[in-house]
């Protein structure tokens, strides 16, 4: 079964399921506990929330990661056993010098939040100007990244 994560949402599951999301300028924060075969994906739309009581914590990098960790530990994952991966953050629109590159800001914020909680980023597929679809296999923690006709594993 494939759990589809929508924009600004968080999905967690156990093996044998997989988790999938479609990304443009958004960034997927992907966590996996190999021992428990528990994984999760946060589909981050923006770098920072305006308040701590945000109704949709998956939308922002600063609120998505704590919520993702909480949901995964409830399924049996251990923070000290987690592997982190990142994908997305494409520059989907041509920007002039006065325009904020949301993809770049999402990448920076997501990396910072992962570092803040003491996790190491094992692999990533970030930036560029093409959207991508990612699929996290909860059997082994592999992440398939599809960009157009290109397919790779991170």
UniProtKB/Swiss-Prot annotation:
Q: What class of enzyme is it?
A: hydrolase
Q: What is the lineage of its organism?
A: Archaea, Methanobacteriati, Methanobacteriota, Methanomada group, Methanococci
Q: What is this protein called?
A: Probable chemoreceptor glutamine deamidase CheD
EC numbers: 3.5.1.44
Q: Which UniProt keywords apply?
A: Chemotaxis, Hydrolase
Quote any Pfam family the record assigns: CheD
**Which reactions does this protein catalyse?**
L-glutaminyl-[protein] + H2O = L-glutamyl-[protein] + NH4(+)
**Gene Ontology terms, MF aspect:** protein-glutamine glutaminase activity
């Amino acid at each position: 079964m494939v759990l589809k994560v929508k924009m600004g949402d968080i999905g967690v599951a156990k093996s044998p399921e997989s988790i999938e999301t479609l990304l443009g300028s958004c960034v997927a924060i992907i966590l996996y506990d190999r021992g428990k075969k528990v994984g999760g994906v946060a589909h981050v739309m923006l770098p920072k929330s305006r308040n701590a009581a945000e109704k949709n914590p998956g939308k922002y990098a600063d609120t998505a990661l704590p919520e993702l960790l909480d949901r995964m530990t409830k399924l049996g994952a251990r923070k000290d056993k987690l592997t982190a991966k990142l994908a997305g953050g494409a520059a989907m629109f041509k920007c002039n010098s006065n325009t904020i590159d949301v993809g770049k800001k999402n990448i920076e914020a997501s990396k910072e939040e992962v570092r803040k909680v003491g996790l190491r980023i094992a692999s990533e597929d970030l930036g560029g100007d093409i959207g991508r679809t990612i699929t996290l296999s909860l059997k082994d923690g592999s992440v398939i990244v599809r960009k157009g006709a290109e397919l790779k594993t991170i």
